[in-house]
Amino acid sequence: MSWLTPALVTIILTVVKAIVVLLAVVICGALLSWVERRLLGLWQDRYGPNRVGPFGAFQLGADMIKMFFKEDWTPPFADKMIFTLAPVIAMGALLVAFAIVPITPTWGVADLNIGILFFFAMAGLTVYAVLFAGWSSNNKFALLGSLRASAQTISYEVFLALSLMGIVAQVGSFNMRDIVQYQIDNVWFIIPQFFGFCTFIIAGVAVTHRHPFDQPEAEQELADGYHIEYAGMKWGMFFVGEYIGIVLVSALLATLFFGGWHGPFLDTLPWLSFFYFAAKTGFFIMLFILIRASLPRPRYDQVMAFSWKVCLPLTLINLLVTGALVLAAAQ
């Protein structure tokens, strides 16, 4: 088969990897809705979903059937094109961002030299999805929720980026595999970049609009915020997109600060690399859910003040100290 060139084989393998990884991420995001409700019930000493199947295991299927048969309604007063585009961007941008995550030494969708910058670009696109949803709905609660969300996301993305610049300064690369290899050769970044880790996880919770930073969706004030007018599959895309964001941020925490696939016995059992990565990612997913179960929601002004007055100075100090140490080591 002369037409089957090495370049074509590479393209086919990349497409197959992309499909497998993206399907796995979507399935994980959907399953998280059931896992979260079960864990919240366990931690809050109540039942949670327990009617559909053993331990409510088929609750996800029931939810999907219900959502599929709900009317996919678009308000007559909405801007229909932008109204439809918003959930596609919200879910699609986070799915595409997962392409840079190296799952094992040999498995990953894309090995980009601008890996971290690519993540920042995709995370920035979610702001447009929120603004589009709020503005196109032609609803005052949706608009207020989208304004809150965009202001919060932009504020926290500032030090989301700065919190990783210490890692970039030490490694000298934006490539995710280079960062993992540096941790394998030296030490996991949770130790030298502890303050960067703390600020990144705070920013990750805020950017994904998770409790306690779910101000854009504050039910008591804004009646579910920017997706109040959404129903059916469009609302489902926002819903699953939020959980995909949790999986993405958890995978990045595992990769950037805990060595990614690195762990013991990889020389003799290389297949363990996938389980190390999955276990680390799963730990941070559980942490997201625990934060929701245990912390109250602050006021919106407190959320914004915490961003600019506490987290931003902390990331700047961490970056300055890291830069000074890197320069001192070079000399």
From Swiss-Prot:
Q: Taxonomically, which superkingdom?
A: Bacteria
- What InterPro entries does this protein's entry cite? NADH_UbQ_OxRdtase_su1/FPO, NADH_UbQ_OxRdtase_su1_CS
Reactions catalysed, as given in the entry: a quinone + NADH + 5 H(+)(in) = a quinol + NAD(+) + 4 H(+)(out)
Pfam families this protein is in? NADHdh
PROSITE patterns with a match to the protein in the record? COMPLEX1_ND1_2 (PS00668)
Is the keyword Membrane assigned to this protein?
Answer: yes
- Signal peptide location: none
Q: Please state the protein's primary subcellular location.
A: membrane
Membrane topology listed for this record: Multi-pass membrane protein
Compartment list: Cell inner membrane
Q: Would you name any one GO CC term?
A: plasma membrane
The UniProt function text for this chain reads: NDH-1 shuttles electrons from NADH, via FMN and iron-sulfur (Fe-S) centers, to quinones in the respiratory chain. The immediate electron acceptor for the enzyme in this species is believed to be ubiquinone. Couples the redox reaction to proton translocation (for every two electrons transferred, four hydrogen ions are translocated across the cytoplasmic membrane), and thus conserves the redox energy in a proton gradient. This subunit may bind ubiquinone.
Q: Which NCBIfam families match?
A: PRK06076.1-1, PRK06076.1-2
Q: How does it assemble?
A: NDH-1 is composed of 13 different subunits. Subunits NuoA, H, J, K, L, M, N constitute the membrane sector of the complex.
| Family (UniProt) | Belongs to the complex I subunit 1 family.
Q: What name does the UniProt record give this protein?
A: NADH-quinone oxidoreductase subunit H
Q: Which organism is it from?
A: Pseudomonas paraeruginosa (strain DSM 24068 / PA7) (Pseudomonas aeruginosa (strain PA7))
